[in-house]
Amino acid sequence: MNNYVKLLNNLEELGLLNIKASIDKYIDLINSGNKSIVDALYELSNLEINAKSDRAMQACVKVANFPFLKEVTDFDFDFQPAINKQQILDLMTLRFIENKENILFVGSSGVGKTHLATSIGIECAKHRYSTYFISFQDLISQLKKALSENRLDIRLRHFCKYKILIIDEIGYLPIDIDAANLFFQLISKRYEKHCTIITTNTNFSKWSNFDLVL
């Protein structure tokens, strides 16, 4: 077995499959004098670094529990002219994360709230910010179950660990006193620490009704 074959075997053993796939091209470039050894090694190492980054990004997107993978480029702003496109594009820069700002999408069903919230969430996940998507009903169901099992603090800490938490469809179904209490416990724990993105069909002026049940 010659050293070339041993090299290929070593690369596979180390899991450096991107380098293995490109090694012949770079050997030819070096032999022809079109690439220095240092440049070749640098570019080959970048192939692995980029692949590792892509895998990490895909893992972040996968665990985020998105209902679908739609990005802002898939959104039809012409269909919803009332939506400020520039404002959405500004949110896609993710400046709101460093400022620990929250995002609230308000509107009736079918206007694209979930699509836009998901698009922002995907961008966050791609930049390897811990992100999680959950419907309000599922969130409250989990918190109520945890409360009944005397482990509410553990579950609240679970949802507080995410840098970006997306809570979808608040107000889609009636909210009882227990649900309101649990929701505001979570929000108060996340406030000014991490970012929360909320979609709701309830006008912001009516959110004071939540305070009444408390």
What are these regions (language model features)?
Residues 102-104, 164:
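Residue-level preference for the first positions of well-ordered beta-strands
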